[in-house]
Curated annotation (Swiss-Prot):
Organism: Arabidopsis thaliana
Protein name: Protein phosphatase 1 regulatory inhibitor subunit PPP1R7 homolog
Function: Inhibitor of protein-phosphatase 1 (PP1). Binds to and inhibits PP1 activity.
Keywords, alphabetical: Leucine-rich repeat, Protein phosphatase inhibitor, Repeat
Assembly mode: Interacts with human protein phosphatase PPP1C.
Length: 328
């Protein structure tokens, strides 16, 4: 089905003279589009482009370029590496295309955001050419099997490598500014965070973890997502006093442990485990009893009784959600 936008006059598109948004115009090329020379942002998301218009090479003021959700392959993106006029580019989005390798972005010496997620990339080889100015790197939903060539990216704040084929957490030592690490849907068995003390959000959902050990030094951690693993014991959490969200659903837990000190905990996901006792949960969450607003416990033995929801509401006076039940 064609987008209604196809019928709109292209010369009227855009928010201003320096922002051009051509999202979802089903364009096969930019032949009918005027590209103002002073563009700062060019958004070509959700079109049918299989190549790059050579006029983009002259946009010397461009800061943001999005080619998300097109048909760009390795040969089509190659000219970018020679377009020196674009050296001030700060954000490059190549998400959801047909890339098989990491493009050469070495000329973008001020790059802050780089997104190559949802492609067919098998290796991070070539990422070493990316500028050390980079703050956000997104490589999710590819086929990468090793964390490599990223040690120089010491300004990284967000690293997204979810839905790949990673087995080992490695080469993270230099990321002293990293705040978010997303590694869900990989094949990781052991947590190795190399003492990332500034990190605030970690996702290791849907991996092969059997232990929670490895987070002890991440004292700034606020959100921890560990669902769909094989964890049988809650441990190594007592020092994580800033934790607000803890998701350990869909594991092999029989009890709730090591969270008594977590006075800031607001969201606790324990559903789909083997937890027997509500009384034990009461004792385990003493520190956050007043703070907790959301708790998931369904599909545990302790959630089978008919008065289970009422009992949980008594334990947590300020709770707003129990499983799918919302309370005003």
């Amino acid at each position: 089905m064609n987008s209604e936008k196809e019928d709109e006059p292209l010369e009227e598109i855009g928010d201003s003279n320096n922002v051009l948004d051509l999202t979802s115009y089903q364009l096969h090329s930019l032949d009918t589009v005027e590209l103002p020379p002073n563009l700062i942002e060019l958004d070509l998301t959700a079109n049918r482009l299989s190549g790059l218009d050579s006029r983009i090479a002259q946009l010397s003021t461009l800061k943001k370029l999005s080619l998300r959700q097109n048909l760009i392959d390795d040969s089509a993106v190659e000219p970018l590496s020679h377009w020196d006029a674009l050296s001030d580019l700060e954000e490059l989005v190549l998400r959801d295309n047909k890339l098989a390798k990491v493009p050469d972005v070495s000329i973008f010496t001020k790059l802050l955001v780089y997104d190559i997620s949802f492609n067919e990339i098998t290796s991070l080889e070539g990422i070493s050419k990316a500028s050390s100015t980079l703050k956000e790197l997104y490589v999710s939903k590819n086929e990468v099997n090793k964390i490599m060539e990223i040690e120089h990216l010491h300004n990284l704040q967000i690293l997204e490598l979810g839905s790949n084929r990673l087995r080992v957490m490695e080469n993270l030592e230099n990321f002293t500014k990293l705040e978010e690490l997303w590694l869900g849907r990989n094949r990781i068995k052991v947590v190795n965070l190399c003492g990332l003390k500034c990190i605030k959000k970690i996702s290791l959902q849907s991996n092969r973890l059997t232990s929670m050990k490895g987070f002890e030094e991440c004292v700034a951690l606020e959100e921890l997502y560990l669902s769909h693993n094989g964890i049988s014991k809650m441990e190594g959490l007592s020092a994580l006093v800033n934790l607000r969200v803890l998701d350990v659903s869909n594991n092999k837990l029989t009890s709730v442990d090591d969270i008594q000190n977590l006075t800031k905990l607001e969201d606790l996901w324990l559903n789909d485990n083997q937890i027997e006792s509500l009384e034990a949960i009461t004792e385990a969450v003493t520190g956050s009893k007043e703070k907790l607003t959301t708790i998931y416990l369904e599909n545990n033995p302790c959630a089978k009784s008919s008065d289970y929801v009422a009992a949980v509401r008594q334990i947590f006076p300020n709770v707003e959600q129990i499983d799918s039940n919302l309370f005003a």
